[in-house]
């Protein structure tokens, strides 16, 4: 049985084509959608979205927390890496998440991203996952620049 993922996707969102070679984990969790939204500071935020399916749920029938954290981590890393020119390769150093509510099957979940600080070696940001205007998950993340990480490991 195939699922038509184009049904019930909010206007403006398009399917996020993932590389099966390099993004197998996210491919397994998808399908992911996105839209690019201009910000006040002249950057573009990529808002990610997903329709919760039964495969995304835990034993209680709500969205699995690990899947939600993966979504927040991906949105944080993607948007932070592209907030500088040129874009930087970043890896997660720390995530802290608060579960506020539980998305259910057929809920549409979107990311909302905010930069806290961008430094030479570390960057900090926050991401909320929302169903409509209701916050489901609040995550703060710390990321390091990949070439800086290699430099520290080699010292």
Model-predicted regions and their roles:
Residues 1-155:
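Terminal targeting signals and extreme-terminal segments of soluble enzymes
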């Amino acid at each position: 049985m195939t699922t038509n993922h184009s049904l019930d996707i909010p206007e403006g969102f398009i399917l996020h084509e993932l590389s099966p070679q390099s993004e197998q984990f996210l491919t397994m969790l998808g399908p992911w959608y996105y839209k690019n939204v201009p910000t006040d500071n002249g950057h573009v935020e990529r808002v990610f979205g997903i329709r919760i399916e039964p495969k995304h749920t835990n034993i209680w029938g709500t969205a699995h927390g690990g899947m939600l954290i993966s979504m927040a981590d991906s949105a944080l890393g993607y948007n932070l890496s592209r907030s500088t020119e040129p874009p930087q390769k970043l890896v997660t150093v720390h995530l802290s998440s608060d579960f506020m509510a539980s998305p259910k099957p057929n809920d549409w979940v979107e990311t909302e991203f905010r930069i806290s600080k961008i430094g030479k070696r570390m960057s900090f940001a926050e991401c909320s996952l929302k169903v409509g205007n209701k916050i489901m998950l609040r995550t703060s993340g710390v990321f390091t620049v990949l070439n800086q990480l290699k430099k520290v490991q080699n010292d």
